[in-house]
A protein has these predicted regions:
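Extracytoplasmic/secreted proteins, especially bacterial periplasmic and envelope-associated proteins
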Residues: 61, 65-68, 91, 95, ...
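Sec-exported extracytoplasmic/periplasmic mature domains
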Residues: 71-75, 97-101, 105, 141, ...
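Extracellular/periplasmic catalytic domains that process cell-envelope and extracellular macromolecules
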Residues: 30-33, 72, 96-98, 126-129, ...
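Solvent-exposed loop/turn segments at secondary-structure junctions
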Residues: 43-46, 83-87, 110-113, 141-142, ...
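N-terminal, active-site-proximal structural segment of metallo-dependent hydrolase catalytic domains
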Residues: 2-8, 14-102, 106-119, 126, ...
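Structured beta-strand-rich core segments of catalytic domains in phosphoester-bond hydrolases
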Residues: 83-172, 277
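Active-site beta-strand/loop signature of hydrolases that rely on acidic residues for catalysis
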Residues: 36-43, 66-89, 136, 164, ...
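Metal-dependent phosphoester-hydrolase catalytic domains
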Residues: 148, 184, 195-203, 211-333
């Protein structure tokens, strides 16, 4: 009996090392698919000059609302846009990740304001403000890379795509977050990068693309690159409007759909969209009676299936890099 107990100890330790599974995970050995909950959300930083004040546009209160709803949703992976960092407000993505107990990675976009890197850094430092995309994850981030996107003729507006490799119990999973200008020359580049990084599991792009779904910018994803629009797949007849919510207005003011979760099928797992809906789309009443929305954007959530059966060849064991790189991130192209 003692010998059998000793043999079981390594098995128990390995199971503990895998960490918390998503709330939708099936039991070990089950053929039922596992769904991960993705959320994309533009946090609304308030503009470059908002860095001069820490709690601009009630940022602290809005972050509490966001953290509470993400916990309620039991989100697994969150793509943020307009994740800001400044002298007064700190690192907003880090603050939100800490509230959730998540891993995170962030890549600033705005220091590259001009062709001159020195001038760009000087202005960003003077304002005490930077912003860019971020990815928050229940699973460890073992590698990441920030891609500078083409300016498409815009002289002082820089945009970037953030890519993160996550170590999950089903194998390495790639997630992306981006905030583009609405120009198809940027979304074509994003689509090219996302498709080039195809692995056995589905890749998921989360972003504010400043473009409606009938536009050439979104067609570059869905029509040309074959990415799957999660919300539209699950809600064929709903408008799904996400932007221009006045954050202190009592009633909804959104007018356009510009926030998307897009899926590129994996080589072994298709990544079926189980469901998708708008989230972070209701206001709160503060103690002083003021109405406050989480952002000027609504969020989008999607449950995307990862089938253990089809991916069985890739999930025999947890990636070894998880233990080797708990804090040190490796950039990749």
């Amino acid at each position: 009996m003692k010998m059998r107990a000793r043999l079981l100890i390594p098995v128990v330790l390995w199971l503990c090392s895998v960490g918390q599974l998503p709330h939708t995970a099936s039991a070990a050995g089950s053929e039922a698919p596992t769904a991960l909950t993705y959320v994309t959300f533009n946090l609304f930083h308030g503009g470059a000059f908002s860095g001069l004040g820490g709690n601009a546009y009630d940022l602290d209160e809005r972050l509490e609302i966001v953290a509470e709803e993400l916990r309620t949703l039991q989100a697994d992976i969150v793509g943020l846009q307009e994740a800001s960092r400044g002298r007064e407000r700190g690192d907003v993505a880090a603050r939100l990740a800490a509230r959730l107990g998540f891993h995170y990675v962030y890549a600033p976009a705005n220091p590259r304001l001009f062709a001159s890197d020195g001038l760009s850094r000087a202005i960003a430092s003077l304002l005490g403000f930077e912003e860019g995309p971020a990815i928050l994850s229940r699973f460890p981030v073992v590698a990441w890379h920030a891609y500078e996107l083409p300016r498409c003729g815009r002289l002082i507006e820089s945009r970037s795509l953030l890519s993160a490799m996550l170590a999950t119990p089903w194998g390495p999973l790639r997630a992306f977050s981006a905030h583009t200008s609405g120009d198809p020359c940027q979304t074509r580049r994003v689509a090219e990068i996302v498709r080039a990084g195809q692995g056995p599991l589905p890749g998921v792009l989360m972003g504010d693309f400043n473009a409606v779904e009938e536009s050439p910018a979104i067609a570059a994803f869905t029509r040309d690159a074959g990415l799957i629009d999660a919300y539209r797949t699950a809600n064929p007849g709903r408008p799904g409007l996400t932007v221009w919510q006045r954050i202190e207005e009592a009633n909804p003011t959104v007018q356009r759909r510009v926030d998307y979760i897009l899926v590129t099928p994996g080589a072994a797992v298709e990544g079926r969209v189980a469901s998708s809906r708008l989230v972070l789309n209701t206001p709160r009443s503060l103690r002083d009676g003021k109405t406050l929305w989480p952002s000027d954007h609504y969020g989008v959530a999607a449950e995307i299936e990862v089938s253990r059966v089809r991916a069985a060849a890739h999930v025999a064991r947890r990636p070894e890099t998880t233990a080797a790189l708990p804090q040190s991130l490796v950039r990749f192209r």
